[in-house]
Regions:
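A short glycine-rich, His/Asp/Glu-containing loop-to-beta-strand
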Residues: 35-39
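Charged, amphipathic alpha-helical segments and their flanking helix caps
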Residues: 1-31, 42-130
């Protein structure tokens, strides 16, 4: 596993309801492409097991962001409901890909992200190791 292979594989998972998938954070978004998914903020941990510098377990973290809708579009209740639906869809996609991607755990949250405008966004922090 490498940073690149994990981020690329995670970016390629299919999440029900996502219209557009990016391989990197987009510089701008079109409402016609929403919900849109992209990776962000990869992290890595490499521990040394002994004094001979044997590498330990390779662990990587990447956040997947799913941009739902601009804040000024729709009502808060409708946008919140869309976020809940997308949380379920993303959770199902991560469950389906746990073995293939060596996923250890994930956590998800709703947040606001700015791409010119502010958007309702779901962010999953996905951890994997091998």
């Amino acid at each position: 596993m490498t940073y690149t292979s994990f981020v690329n594989a995670l970016s390629a998972i299919r999440v029900a309801g996502v219209k557009r998938q990016y391989t990197a954070p987009p510089s701008q978004l079109s409402s016609a492409d929403l919900p849109a998914m992209h990776p962000q903020l990869p992290e890595h941990t490499q521990e040394v097991i002994n004094l001979v510098s044997s590498p330990g377990m390779f662990a990587v973290v990447c956040e997947l962001a799913i941009v739902i809708k601009a804040n000024q579009q729709g009502t808060a209740a409708a946008n919140f409901a869309e976020c809940l639906t997308m949380l379920d869809a993303l959770n199902n996609a991560l469950i389906d890909n746990t073995s293939a991607l060596n996923i250890d755990r994930w956590s998800m949250r709703q947040t606001a992200v700015e791409y010119g405008d502010t958007y309702w966004t779901i962010v999953a922090r996905v951890e994997a190791s091998e």
